[in-house]
Amino acid sequence: MDNEEQKITLVDEHGNEELYNVLFTFDSEDYGRSYVLLYPSEAEADEEVDIQAYAFMPDENHDLGEGELIPIESDEEWDMVEEVLNTFLGDQDQD
């Protein structure tokens, strides 16, 4: 990812839009899917935030693009995403 933060707008079931920053994306060979982790764009740097995770179908450049986000539904898939997130956060703490 380049220095410019990627942003994405999520629309809830009531039609409200909220802007999120892309924390990172990754692929899973085990599940054959790509994933994106997001956090609210108005969050402060030292603020604890709820991180959202979704599966997505990458575009031809293997980027997030304009595609639809797919909810993660299985416990096994959530466990894998949490493990990747914890590894990412652990690596960030070491920097």
Curated annotation (Swiss-Prot):
Which Pfam families does this entry report, sorted A to Z?
Answer: DUF1292
Q: Where does the signal peptide begin and end? A: none
InterPro entries xrefs: UPF0473 (IPR009711)
Say which domain of life the source belongs to. Bacteria
The record's disulfide annotation reads none
**What family does this chain come from, according to its entry?**
Belongs to the UPF0473 family.
Question: NCBIfam families this protein is in?
Answer: PRK13678.1-2, PRK13678.1-4
Listed name of the protein = UPF0473 protein PEPE_1260
Origin species, per record, is Pediococcus pentosaceus (strain ATCC 25745 / CCUG 21536 / LMG 10740 / 183-1w)
